[in-house]
Amino acid sequence: MPRHPQHELDLQLCFPLYAASRALTRAYGPLLAEAGLTYPQYLTMLALWSSDAPPTVGQLGAKLRLDSGTLTPLLKRLEAMGLLTRLRDATDERRVVVTLTEAGDALQDDLADVPAGVVELLGVDLAQAQALRGLLDDIIEHLDANA
């Protein structure tokens, strides 16, 4: 028993967020299995699909909140799968631009039902899911502003 009641695991805000994140990541597994993607690879593809122009590795890392040591192996694997290419920027060789291949772009259609499938697995309606997303965005924004 903790000496301080505030140290009870069940009273911590962080623990249900952590547990929900892990459970949600597991829930994506079967939905992504046919495409052969892991959850982090799927997030990377989502970021690429939503980019107006091919991003640099740095821009993609910022969007995904991943450092280059984590992102580079993800990109290498997706490149080996034929879903994207990484090329040095012709105007600045320090920058690497990430571009979807035709197969990577086409995969977007194959996975179009994944977001709805996840909402269904959550056991909440769309309005509740959107409210949760808004609250989480607010928390992230606040924590980033105070970091």
Where are these regions (language model features)?
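N-terminal helix-turn-helix DNA-binding core of bacterial DNA-binding proteins
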Residues: 15, 22, 26-67
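Charged, amphipathic alpha-helical coiled-coil/dimerization segments
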Residues: 76-134
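C-terminal regulatory/oligomerization modules of transcriptional regulators
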Residues: 1-5, 102, 124-147
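Conserved amphipathic alpha-helical interaction elements at protein-protein interfaces in regulatory
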Residues: 34, 50, 77, 85, ...
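Alpha-helical linker/hinge and terminal dimerization helices associated
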Residues: 20, 24-27, 64, 107-125, ...
